[in-house]
Amino acid sequence: PQIQTVGVFVNEAPETVAELLNAGIIDIAQLHGQEDETYIHRLRKLTNKPLIQAVRVTDAASLANAQKSPADLILLDSGAGGTGTAFDWTVLDKFSRLYFLAGGLGPDTVGNAVKRFHPYAVDVSSGIETAGKKDPAKMAAFVAAVRKNDK
């Protein structure tokens, strides 16, 4: 399988995102700011490339909005990336579309999250760091926990 490049954007002009996608510089755009349905529809008119919308899960309304997002995939997180904080994952029992799970994941938590909620993918940053740097042992333990529980 080919490794796909993902550009992460926070409130970037849709024209800029589309230009990078259409030129083949990136394969997928992850929208991690306040991009709403109108923004995504506008971006859709400029490109047909895959879009991931990051949604901060703060309450039932934020999850309901994620459910109807026009993005191809949803990344559910507790806040701005890299905080290491989880949201109340039990709300995922009622979420019916493909999603990436982020926030509060680490080698000790990802296995149970994958086994119970079956996300399409998981996203991790600070959960595999030691003293602010990626830790190879934590990365290996994280991947092993996902593989063990992804059945």
What do the PLM-derived regions correspond to, one by one?
Residues 19, 23, 34-126, 130-131, ...:
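Short loop-to-alpha-helix "cap/lid" segments that border enzyme active sites
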